[in-house]
Amino acid sequence: MSFRLLIFAHDLRFTRLWRGNYTTSSHYWGQMIVGDLKPLEEIVSAIKEYKQILVLGCGSCVTVCLSGGEKEAEQLCHELSKVRHYEGAPPKFEMGCILRQCEEDLVHEYQTIPEGTDAILSLACGAGVQTVADAHDPLPVIPALNTTFLGASAKPGIWAEMCRGCGDCVLTYTGGICPVARCAKSLFNGPCGGSQNGSCEVGLDTPCAWAMIYYRLKRQDKLHLLDEIRAPKDWRPGGAGGPRKRIRLGLGEGKSS
């Protein structure tokens, strides 16, 4: 049940910020993405085939909402290390945490993949999972959270949409590439007839998400995931049931009476 702790952060003041004033932290980043831990059974099912897994926390939004930071990654490592979750021996786990998984420069500069790692279990939002998956292709990157909803950012610049906070993350089965956000039609059964030579019909400069998914899974030797029959997607966690709200008992107005 032991695991090794790896910290990837370039400034210790951020660690104090994460565990200090959460309001200040949220304001500092100028954005807020909320995620919920996936059911433990789903996580175990996704990782049981691997032998050595890096559980990777993210020190930004999901730390603020108490879902995917250093502390939560450590707790998940402890729980997943328990033999009772597996038919055979459990995988070996190592834990790390970087400042932001959604920034490619930080992922490359401050993240070291331990030797022998055959999968990464990411506690980031969907954008972070995909950034790590792109950086370490073809190493499988598995989401441990369901990204639920996204706040606004007023920062200048350009951002590429990678996640829509559908609340039912499927990146485990699509090679770390989101069909909801990155397919123009949010298709779940492969490319449409308008896809040509790896490009989407909306424009040659827009890659076809399903072409990317296919070739990513091919590099991972996991094309069999495309043959599996899955239940229709549940869109209710994505906001189809009305505006969403997260409550953490014991914090501010969410304090239990």
Locations of the language-model features?
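Iron-sulfur (Fe-S) cluster-binding modules
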Residues: M1-M95, D105-I120, D134-Y173, I177-S257
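Membrane-embedded and interfacial regions of multi-pass energy-transducing membrane proteins
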Residues: R100-Q101
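N-terminal glycine-rich "phosphate-gripper" loop used for MgATP/nucleotide binding
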Residues: S122-G126
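Short, well-ordered alpha-helical microsegments
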Residues: G128-T131
